[in-house]
Amino acid sequence: MLIGYVRVSTNEQNTALQRNALESAGCELIFEDKASGKQTERPGLKKVLRMLSRGDTLVVWKLDRLGRSMRHLVVLVEELRDRGINFRSLTDSIDTSTPMGRFFFHVMGALAEMERELIVERTRAGLDAARAEGRIGGRRPKYQEETWQQMRRLLENGIPRKQVAIIYDVAVSTLYKKFPASSFQS
């Protein structure tokens, strides 16, 4: 059975173009979402994925209607393949029921993996370069060591953690982490 999925990014956009194309392609059922592709919560996609069974074909108007990213798209199509479900994108002329369509997705998978590895490599190189210049990754600490020592002295002098937290605008739980209860009486 051919089952379609349409998605538009906003409620103001119309699904008619995609829906007509899927109906012309022979889709018996069509599920839809009106949400950004970056959103993970897409109820229409969840429903169509539950509905599909071995031998079915998931049909979309265009690749970007299905996946949030190349990596997400490749993972999704691999999951479909593992379940014995084919995938077809009408405007991109991709059909995983054909040898050429399967080959195309193998290439896409390799490209997505390479992209992920390049991102990891660039991130590591950037962090290494920053460390070599004496910079440490992450945001700057909210308090300098001197401020933490002031907090410690207040706690040592019996000031309750709650008061210290209010004075320095820090969570009481942070004070417990930084200065364990066994260290002080408060």
Swiss-Prot record:
The keyword DNA-binding applies. The active site is at 9 (o-(5'-phospho-dna)-serine intermediate). Residues 1-134 form the Resolvase/invertase-type recombinase catalytic domain. One of its GO terms (biological process) is DNA integration. Keywords: DNA integration, DNA invertase, DNA recombination, DNA-binding, Viral receptor tropism switching, Virus entry into host cell. PROSITE patterns: RECOMBINASES_1, RECOMBINASES_2, RECOMBINASES_3. Residues 161-180 bind DNA. CDD domains: SR_ResInv. One of its GO terms (molecular function) is DNA binding. The keyword Oxidoreductase does not apply. Belongs to the site-specific recombinase resolvase family. Performs inversion of a viral 3 kp segment (C-segment) that encodes two alternate pairs of tail fiber proteins thereby modifying the host specificity of the virus. This is DNA-invertase. The gene is cin.
